[in-house]
Amino acid sequence: MLTRKQHELLLFIHARLKETGIPPSFDEMKEALDLASKSGIHRLITALEERGFIRRLPNRARALEVLRLPDSIAPGLAAPRKFSPSVIEGGQGRSSPAPRPAANNDDETSVVSIPVMGRIAAGVPIDAIQHRTHSIGVPPDMITGGEHYALEVKGDSMIEAGIFDGDTVIIRQTQAANPGDIVVALVDEEEATLKRFRRKGASIALEAANPAYETRIFGPDRVKVQGRLVGLIRRY
């Protein structure tokens, strides 16, 4: 079974070969999948080759051949899209956000509508799935500038950060983070997780908010910050 990024890359290569007869360059693939580095493309190509979907032709630059496509092509996978986290797991921050009551969407003058991008699953990171589920109204003072989205919490991996099952976290899109921030982090261009951001020398540590989950250490090229926690909404 292919991950979404593997699936998207395979379809992008296939479409380019059908259109021009020439495989895309690594720069083109990186840009199409909105990856931070070519190393992510190398890993995806290696995974596709190991699974028998493509092969690299020897002694030829940019030589890729698509051997087969998945038996079932899911709708919406034909064109790569920018990453939008929708299934991620909880993390821990320096301080817990104070929960806010859910806003009344009927009062358009008192709320700002932002997209809910999916659910936060407790446990280890899960493959990032890109889709918008619905919208939610939040208090205007929770939106301090920039683009925002919401994620629904499911599970216990954020309990010591004061974030519980059923809560909705508000995320501000950013690629920067300070130590101790709760961030949405993209790991290896494929998996998303909500964790406490730390630096350990040249490495990055992603800490859980539950002692049952170990801190995970990654090289800096393996982690890409996608957003920072700025608020929380709780329904009663």
Curated annotation (Swiss-Prot):
Residues 84-107 are annotated as: Disordered. One of its GO terms (molecular function) is serine-type endopeptidase activity. Pfam families: LexA_DNA_bind (PF01726), Peptidase_S24 (PF00717). The keyword Chloroplast does not apply. Keywords: Autocatalytic cleavage, DNA damage, DNA repair, DNA replication, DNA-binding, Hydrolase, Repressor, SOS response, Transcription, Transcription regulation. It comes from the Bacteria. It catalyses: Hydrolysis of Ala-|-Gly bond in repressor LexA. Its EC number is 3.4.21.88. SUPFAM superfamilies: LexA/Signal peptidase, Winged helix' DNA-binding domain. The active site is at residues 157, 195. The keyword DNA damage applies. One of its GO terms (biological process) is DNA replication. Residues 26-46 bind DNA. Represses a number of genes involved in the response to DNA damage (SOS response), including recA and lexA. In the presence of single-stranded DNA, RecA interacts with LexA causing an autocatalytic cleavage which disrupts the DNA-binding part of LexA, leading to derepression of the SOS regulon and eventually DNA repair. NCBIfam families: lexA. PANTHER family: LEXA REPRESSOR, LEXA REPRESSOR-RELATED. Homodimer. This is LexA repressor. It comes from Chelativorans sp. (strain BNC1). The gene is lexA.
